[in-house]
Every structure is written in structure tokens, then in C-alpha cells.
Design a protein with these regions (language model features):
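Bacterial N-terminal signal peptides
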Residues: 7-17
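Bacterial N-terminal signal peptides that target proteins for export
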Residues: 1-7
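Extracellular/periplasmic carbohydrate-active domains that bind, remodel
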Residues: 17-216
Length: 216
């Protein structure tokens, strides 16, 4: 039995201060120009990372996730002065391989989930567009029960990824995207200043525990 989706729409919410719009835009870096396949099977993390790194190194701009394709990817990190823009019907899909997730947002505490899309000690980062970021949550679960999924056995290490983790970022905009199917927390903000979250949708499976929407 499928759980009801949880819809959480945020409209013009300002977190942690009055936020200006990051100075992104400018040059566009299409991730397919850096080798991304967008077939939903190939791990496109290296191509996405290359586009982000080049964009930031060149002074900033927009990293484009093109419309109508699914880009399966392992963890990657954001960079200063970069707007990650998801075109309509595009999707970033978390790699279901648990071994890909090795970094915890809680330093040495590896029992509270890992990071998938993340950034730390950055300036002017934004995630925009009407595409989707899909945490592929069921792939990290055990057996489906009537009202929940079993958690796979863990000791001091829980590989379930948080979808988006931002640590000590100065100026962040998250706008219009749909974030869905998280295996753990969805948006996790730690020590960030000047954050705007506007018009996003969070659609998580209620049978997956710890599927928080936004944790500050």
C-alpha cells in the first residue's frame, strides 16, 4: 500500500535574516556539456561536479540541469556564486548505492545519516527551477510494512542520505523546486545566514521515518 505523499509548500519564507538575491545568472554551464548522460542509470555526479567547479572558478553563473531528463548521481558539493537551475521535468536522482555516501553532516557522528547534495563555507548559493530533486528514499529502506518501512540494520553508521545539507553558507536561495522521496532529512541548514526559501514543494513518503521537511 502506498503512503500518502506529504505536500509542504513554502511561499516567501525568509529564514535567518532578510535575504538578498545571490549574484548568479550570467554564463550558463549545461551539465551535459561536461559528460552527463541523463539516462537515469549512469552516475552523472562527476559531470555535475565538473560543471559546478568550472562555474565557480570562472566567477559564477548558472549550472543547468536540462529539461526532460533524469540524472542519477552520487554525492556532489555546491560552490560559491553558483546557481543550480533545474529546468521543467528534469530530475536529480540519488544513487541507490549506499557505499557512495561517506560524509556526515555531524562530523564524527555517522549514525544520523549522510550527505548527498551539500555545501560548506560558501557564499551566494542558489537552487532554482521547476525540476525535481529525488532522494530515492525507498531504495535505502528495508521491508515494507503496513504503516512504515523497516530500517536496515545499522550500528554506528546509517548510510541514508539527507537530500540537501548546507553548512555555514552566506546568502542562499532555494526557490520553486520540488524535493521528494527523501530517505532522511530533506533540507538541513547549519549555521547559515541570510536564507530565502520560496515556493518549494516537499513530497515525502510518510512510511519512511525521519523524513523531516526543513531542519534549522
Amino acid at each position: 500500500m502506498r503512503a500518502k505523499a506529504f505536500l509542504f509548500v513554502l511561499c516567501s519564507i525568509l529564514l535567518l535574516g532578510a535575504c538578498g538575491t545571490p549574484k548568479t545568472g550570467g554564463t550558463i554551464y549545461n551539465i551535459m556539456d561536461y559528460g552527463a548522460k541523463g539516462d537515469g542509470v549512469t552516475d552523472d555526479a562527476a559531470a555535475i561536479q565538473a560543471a559546478i567547479d568550472q562555474c565557480s572558478k570562472s566567477g559564477g553563473g548558472t549550472v543547468l540541469v536540462p529539461a526532460g531528463r533524469t540524472f542519477m548521481c552520487s554525492p556532489f558539493h555546491l560552490a560559491s556564486f553558483v546557481e543550480l537551475h533545474l529546468e521543467p521535468n528534469s530530475c536529480l536522482l540519488a544513487n541507490p548505492d549506499e557505499a557512495a555516501y561517506t560524509l556526515s553532516a555531524f562530523r564524527d557522528n555517522r549514525g544520523e545519516g549522510m550527505m548527498w547534495i551539500y555545501g560548506q563555507d560558501l557564499k551566494e548559493v542558489s537552487i532554482t527551477g521547476t525540476g525535481a530533486i529525488d532522494g530515492n528514499g525507498v531504495s535505502f529502506m528495508g521491508k515494507e510494512l503496513e504503516d512504515s518501512y523497516e530500517l536496515k540494520p545499522v550500528t554506528d553508521f546509517d548510510p541514508r542520505p539527507h537530500v540537501l545539507t548546507l553548512i555555514d553558507i552566506e546568502k542562499t536561495v532555494i526557490r520553486d523546486v520540488t524535493i521528494r522521496n527523501s530517505a532522511y532529512w530533506t533540507v538541513h541548514l547549519i549555521g547559515c545566514n541570510d536564507v530565502s526559501i520560496d515556493g518549494i514543494s516537499i513530497l515525502n513518503n510518510l512510511k519512511i521515518r525521519n523524513g523531516d521537511g526543513i531542519d534549522v
